Regions:
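N-terminal Rossmann NAD(P)H-binding glycine-rich loop of SDR-like oxidoreductase domains
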Residues: 3-22
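Generic hydrophobic/aromatic pocket-lining and core-packing "Φ" positions
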Residues: 17, 87-88, 322
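C-terminal active-site/capping subdomain that shapes the small-molecule cofactor and substrate pocket
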Residues: 254-378
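A generic structural motif
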Residues: 23-28, 32
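NAD(P)H-binding glycine-rich loop region in Rossmannoid oxidoreductase-like domains
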Residues: 27, 37, 41-110
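Helix N-cap at the beta1-alpha1 junction of Rossmann-like dinucleotide-binding domains, i.e.
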Residues: 10, 34-36
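Active-site-lining helix/loop region of Rossmann-like oxidoreductase modules
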Residues: 6, 146-292, 299
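Glycine-/Pro-rich loop/turn segments that contact NAD(P) or position catalytic residues
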Residues: 79-183, 222
Length: 379
């Protein structure tokens, strides 16, 4: 399958390219606006990978895809919070499959309704949000609640290592909702809380506690519809160095007071200076997903899944869902024709070999009042 990775030499695109290049079923093309960088990176991969200059925002993007004869486009060039659907629309018009790593709430949640007809006409498959959220997060929730009678609350936190490589586009994406009101499902009703404000302590299995604050992601909207009866869904991000978490809280305060209109415009400055704090952090990052509900025996239960990624390997995690889906498509085993959000398309067991490849440790801890091991089946 001829696969083009847009942003193929970027923070996430490069990781996806390294994973897919050795796959015998994939002919890899590294795409970007700089032909020299794309070609040099492709040559470093070997395995017949090629580089190509391509601009996803150009008016002849569809024609470029058709000229290359691309079967699958993997879109990694964020931030997605500010993007429209021109790229996936062009991919559908070119008759190719589509995967992206979007974490923008509106981009992912509105994706099926906006693109399903176009991809059905093309006879192709499109998946939005093939990343840590909601692809991995939904796989974890499905695993933890297997056999349960109901799930009442879902609480997710991602805690990146301070030393892990940071993409400016990712930073711009999270700054976009800093201090902005975010709609969340809490106590069985919709309410609003400001992004990146009011951090709380979050416990991890293999890391010291960190303070996490609300971020706007697709799960906050997708999960209340996906998991019948759930009363609360929360997502937080927890930065390792406390002063950086407090800095985001200050930016949130300034925006709420009308003193800072567009925090995302600070992304270049914060990206350039972020390394100053690396000496105060580590190479260890991770993620936790906690659920509460009623287990198979009718008892109150609380269960948590943890992952810890050392050696600054944390950024591999957001790439895994796209890698797994691309391999499945190359085998002819992809999701059904049409446009989908990624929730529920992958199982946690499919991620397990990828975790092992990078030496990541996972734990399932049953924290419920029942004290019994009634929750998730073992991996």
């Amino acid at each position: 399958m001829k696969t083009l990775v847009l942003g193929g030499y970027g923070n996430f695109g490069a990781r996806i390219c390294r994973a897919l290049a050795p796959d015998a079923g994939i002919e890899l093309w590294v795409g970007g606006r700089d032909a020299d960088r794309a070609t040099a990176f492709a040559q470093s991969l070997g395995a017949g990978a090629r580089g190509v200059r391509i601009d996803a925002q150009s008016p002849d993007f569809t024609q470029g895809l058709q000229h290359l004869g691309v079967d699958l486009v993997i879109h990694t060039a964020g931030p997605f919070q500010s993007q429209d659907y021109r790229v996936p629309q062009a991919v559908a018009a070119a008759g190719a499959h589509y995967i992206d790593l979007a974490d923008g709430r509106r981009f992912v949640c509105d994706f099926p309704a906006a693109l399903d007809a176009a991809f059905r006409r093309a006879g192709r498959t499109a998946v939005a949000g093939a990343s840590s959220v909601p692809a991995l997060s939904s796989a974890v929730v499905d695993h933890l609640m297997a056999g349960w009678q109901r799930v009442m609350s879902i609480d997710i936190c991602i805690a990146p290592a301070q030393g892990a490589p940071r993409g400016q586009a990712t930073l711009a994406g999270v700054l976009a909702y800093c201090g902005a009101p975010i709609r969340i499902w809490q106590d069985g009703r919709w309410t609003a809380q400001p992004g990146w404000a009011n951090p709380v302590e979050v416990q991890f299995a293999r890391m010291q506690p960190r303070r996490g604050a609300l971020c706007d992601i697709p799960d906050l909207e997708l999960f209340p519809a996906r998991y019948a009866g759930v009363q609360s869904v929360m997502f937080r991000a927890a930065l390792e160095v406390g002063i950086t978490q407090r800095a985001f809280a200050v930016l949130a305060f300034l925006r709420r007071k009308g003193l800072l209109r567009s925090p995302e415009k600070l992304a270049p400055l914060l990206h350039a200076t972020g390394g100053v704090f690396d000496a105060f952090g580590s190479a260890l990052g991770g993620m936790v997903v906690r659920i509460e509900g009623t287990d198979a025996q009718g008892a109150a239960a609380r269960c948590a899944w943890h992952i810890a990624a050392d050696d600054n390997h944390g950024p591999e995690i957001p790439c895994m869902a796209a890698i797994l889906l691309a391999r499945r498509m190359a085998r002819g085993d992809g999701p059904p024709i049409g446009a989908h959000a990624s929730a529920g398309l992958l199982s946690l067991s499919e991620f397990t070999p990828e975790f092992a490849r990078w030496g990541m440790a996972t734990d399932v801890i049953h924290e419920g009042a029942s004290g019994a091991n009634h929750g998730a089946p073992p991996l």
